[in-house]
Amino acid sequence: MPLQIFNTTKRTIDETLLAEVIRLVIGEEGGAVGSIEAIYCGNKMIRRINRDFLGHDYVTDTITFGYNEGGEVDGEFYISLDVIESNARRFGVSFEDELLRVTIHSALHLMGYDDETSELRAAMSLREDHYLYRLRH
């Protein structure tokens, strides 16, 4: 199965641009898209997934599950458009830029990046900045 994007909300998002950024990140990081599902949802769904699979009973911006075995990148990620909207306001950025950043972040997780420490978070943030710049120039 190839890259598939699902929007479970009523909000309109640019699925073509999101697919482009996922392919860009996976390709530039040395991977090949195998079977990736990107699910854009609301707070109710992401909270349920966070609780049922990770044991955390709260909303978050993204949850990523990687299933890589071999050369192709396989996995799925969930992004809450509700959290994206509130974070965009909080950080003073556009909804689209925050959505792109978190999509890039999720793709980086599929490529093995981690953000458990401040150093790892800083490294991921630099990669996110790199890809946002690439998309805008």
UniProtKB/Swiss-Prot annotation:
Keywords: Cytoplasm, Endonuclease, Hydrolase, Metal-binding, Nuclease, Ribosome biogenesis, rRNA processing, Zinc. It is an enzyme of class 3 (hydrolase). Its EC number is 3.1.-.-. One of its GO terms (biological process) is rRNA processing. Belongs to the endoribonuclease YbeY family. It holds the Pfam family YbeY. The keyword Zinc applies. PANTHER family: ENDORIBONUCLEASE YBEY, CHLOROPLASTIC. Its cofactor is Zn(2+). The lineage of its organism: Bacteria, Pseudomonadati, Chlorobiota, Chlorobiia, Chlorobiales. This is Endoribonuclease YbeY.
